Amino acid sequence: MTGNSIEVRDLTRVFGKFTAVDHVTFDVRRGEIFGFLGANGAGKSTTIRILCGLLGPTSGTATVGGFDIGREPDRVKERIGYMSQKFSLYEDLTVDENISFFGGVYGLSRDRVREKMPWVLEMAGLWGRERSLTRELSVGWKQRLALGCAILHEPEIVFLDEPTGGVDPVSRRNFWELINRLSGGGVTVFVTTHYLDEAEYCNDIRLIHAGRVVAGGSPREMKRTYIRNPILEVECDRVVDAMEMLQKEDWVLETSIFGAYLHVSVGDEAEGKAKVRRLLEANGIAVRRMDRIVPSLEDVFIQRIEQESGDGDLRGTK
């Protein structure tokens, strides 16, 4: 048996004339946090539904927990926990009723659910609220409860589909602490997200665009492999005008808006700084600060998507 929890080979899913997942291949090692990144509609959720046995592939193969998703879907489902984008909780049930319900779904006896109940309540921080209706909980509390319900049966692999969507930054950080605890206990965590800062928490990453994997590796490897030229962060007036001017220059490799700043990729740091300053100031745009920065995964994402798009139609997006 290999050291992989998940093995995917040429996985493809077609809906009519639309290819949602296009010959995707990757491995997920046991006990790691694996991030599947991409914009909305890139194919993340379709992939995760196939791996959970909720949707069949058009072609290709995959094994989850050592079992083939096509031939042995029931064996796969016994070994996984799944948390969907909408958390899949029943709003009109109380906290403990939701836990009991999902325990039954996963085949746990009533006695076993009672044994696990305190653990879920403690993990989710919901002691004293077990009789509260789920609809009365904040989004952050619902998120933690949904995770508790998904891992109630102690699965070896957990699939989390956009688990932090619509959650405030503090709740997001707390949720990732829970994910790290799971991974530290030997659970394999497969998480889809479009929050690129969250990908820094992952051991391994795949970036999917238009159904195809376009980049992969650890966060450090991806920055080193896909970003080879200096990136300058420019603080200036009239950011949009500045970006449009820079995009017309042959010596500018890539440019994107990041909040109130510009990120500009150039071939040479010193020469690039001089040219950026000269161009902008000649057009009446004051440059307040310009520094070379360590590239982020967002830089990788934007650069790879622009390269895949060909015409750079994502320039200026964040």
Q: What are these model-derived regions, one by one?
A:
Residues 158-161:
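Catalytic Walker B motif of ABC-type/P-loop ATPase nucleotide-binding domains
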Residues 92, 133-140:
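Conserved ABC ATPase signature
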Residues 177-191, 196-267:
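ABC transporter nucleotide-binding domain
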Residues 147:
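Hydrophobic anchor residue at the start of the ABC signature
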Residues 100, 104, 111-129:
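Conserved ABC ATPase "signature" region
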Residues 154:
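Conserved catalytic motifs of ABC-family nucleotide-binding domains
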